[in-house]
Every structure is written in structure tokens, then in C-alpha cells.
């Protein structure tokens, strides 16, 4: 409890800082060909500690190409469409403790779903640069297809 109290006092400011970073990345990714962002309802309250975007109906090889190109430039993205879970990207079909029925509509979305954590150690300038890198690499792979 003693460790948590000071953090609780700063929680509002921390949430605002995350959202500023999220909004910077989001603005930089807007209108990227081949990339979809999930529109957020105006009334929604959220904490943008990560951002998700969609490369809908992309071949797995093209998604992997984007991930590799971004990684080569220092931007680590996580993909929910990989055959095996990586980090926090597990899907329902990789859960070993419960059987599942096929969910083709979910599979289609997960096959193109990309996630990136946004730590508070990133400055707004870092976030703008990261968005430019993602935009450039997605655009390059999309145009080559």
C-alpha cells in the first residue's frame, strides 16, 4: 500500500501522458494505405498504453515483412496472427486449457492485428518518429504487393 499511494496520486497525469503519446502515434498512422485504425467513440474513456492497428487481409508473409522492417529500424511490434503465441499475443486457438470451436471472423481480424506498447519513457517526439517509421514500412510493403 505504501508503494501504491504515490502512484495513485499521479494516476490522472500518467493517463493523460499515455493518451498524448497514443494520440501522437495514432495521428501519424492516419490514412496510411493498407493500415486501418479502430475509430474510438468520442465518449470513450481509455488509457493509451498500447495501440493496435489492422493490416486486414494481408498475406502472412507481408505482415512478417512489415514486422521485420520495423524491427530493423528499432520499432518492436507484436502480431496476433503468428502460428505460435509471442509474448502477450496468444489467441483462442493457442489456449491449451480449453477446447475451442473455429471462429473464422475472429481469425480474419487476428491475422492482421498488430499491437505496440507505448511506454511513458517515450517522448512525444519519439512517438512521432515511431509513427513515421511504421507508416513508411507499411507503405513500402503495401505498394510492393
Residue spans for each PLM region:
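Short, conserved charged micro-motifs
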Residues: 58-66, 122-129
Amino acid at each position: 500500500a505504501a508503494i501504491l499511494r504515490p502512484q495513485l496520486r499521479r494516476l490522472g497525469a500518467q493517463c493523460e501522458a499515455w493518451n498524448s503519446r497514443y494520440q501522437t502515434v495514432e495521428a501519424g498512422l492516419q490514412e496510411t494505405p493498407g493500415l486501418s485504425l479502430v475509430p474510438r467513440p468520442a465518449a470513450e474513456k481509455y488509457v493509451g498504453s498500447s495501440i493496435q492497428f489492422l493490416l486486414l487481409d494481408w498475406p502472412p508473409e507481408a505482415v512478417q515483412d512489415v514486422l521485420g522492417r520495423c524491427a530493423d529500424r528499432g520499432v518492436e511490434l507484436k502480431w496476433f496472427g503468428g502460428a505460435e503465441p509471442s509474448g502477450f499475443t496468444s489467441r483462442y486457438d493457442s489456449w491449451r486449457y480449453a477446447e475451442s470451436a473455429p471462429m473464422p471472423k475472429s481469425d480474419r481480424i487476428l491475422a492482421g492485428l498488430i499491437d505496440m506498447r507505448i511506454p511513458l519513457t517515450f517522448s512525444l517526439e519519439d512517438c512521432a518518429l515511431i509513427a513515421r517509421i511504421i507508416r513508411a514500412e507499411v507503405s513500402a510493403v503495401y505498394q510492393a504487393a
